[in-house]
Regions:
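P-loop NTP-binding core
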Residues: 1-239
């Protein structure tokens, strides 16, 4: 059985990255896939999104990156089916500066995950909204990435930068990295602009955009504050 590691990455904040991460991982778990969520965002919203109190966590992804703690000792089983978590807390905010001192600064996460990769069918990484060392570590450790994209005109501004980063990672650190797909989030069917954005994205990423779009949804927006993926919070919420 092959394990697959996927980064959810967009250096723009507020595009539904964490929501995508938590719910994608929860869906895989419900489908019977053993799934590990890796929270690499110092804000720790993925951690709280699966019901873990990030202020109570003694050790986090910071410790596997900087202190060489074994990842298996830090993994938390969530209350959700087949879903485990490597949590984040505020310590992670200092990780970029500390990683900068390391010789293998881009490969710290890959090295930390290596002993446990085969324990999971999927590893899903929530990247911080930046092009810094944490995101580069995520991309170096991943087989593929999914780019959540808000359907608005400004969403396109960061795309060439994002593609440049992916190219750099492929060239120097991880030649196997592939773009899995582009996921449209916060989709409002009433807006004409959405379809313009979609046409333009299709030029950037031919055949990479998912047909499924994630509409704006109150329930989807509420679920994280209850620490639950959408399937456990409001199963019949409009998809």
């Amino acid at each position: 059985c092959m394990s697959k590691t996927v980064s959810i990455f967009n250096q723009k904040g507020g595009v539904g990255k964490t929501t995508t991460c938590v719910n994608f991982a929860a869906a895989l778990g419900l489908k019977g896939k053993k799934t590990l969520l890796v929270d690499l965002d110092p804000q720790g919203n993925t951690t709280s999104g699966v019901g873990i109190d990030k202020t109570e966590i003694e050790k986090s992804t910071y410790d596997i990156l900087i202190n060489d703690e074994p990842a298996k000792d830090i993994v938390i089983q969530t209350q959700f089916k087949n879903l485990s978590l490597l949590p984040a807390n505020m310590n992670l905010a200092g990780a970029e500066l500390e990683l900068a001192e390391e010789e293998n600064r881009f490969k710290a996460l890959k090295k930390a995950l290596a002993p446990i990769v085969m324990d999971y069918d999927f590893i899903i990484i929530d990247c911080p909204p930046s092009l810094g060392l944490l995101s580069l570590n995520a991309l170096t450790a991943s087989d593929t990435l999914i780019v959540p994209l808000q359907c608005e005109y400004y969403a396109l501004e960061g795309l060439s930068q994002l593609l440049g980063t992916v190219r750099t990672v492929k060239q120097h650190y991880n030649e196997h990295l592939e773009l899995e797909g582009v996921l449209y989030t916060m989709y409002d069917t009433r807006l004409k602009l959405n379809s313009q954005v979609i046409d333009e994205v299709n030029q950037y990423f031919p055949n990479k955009a998912y047909k499924t779009t994630i509409p704006r949804s109150v329930k989807l927006a509420e679920a994280p504050s209850f620490g639950k993926p959408i399937f456990y919070y409001e199963k019949y919420s409009k998809p």
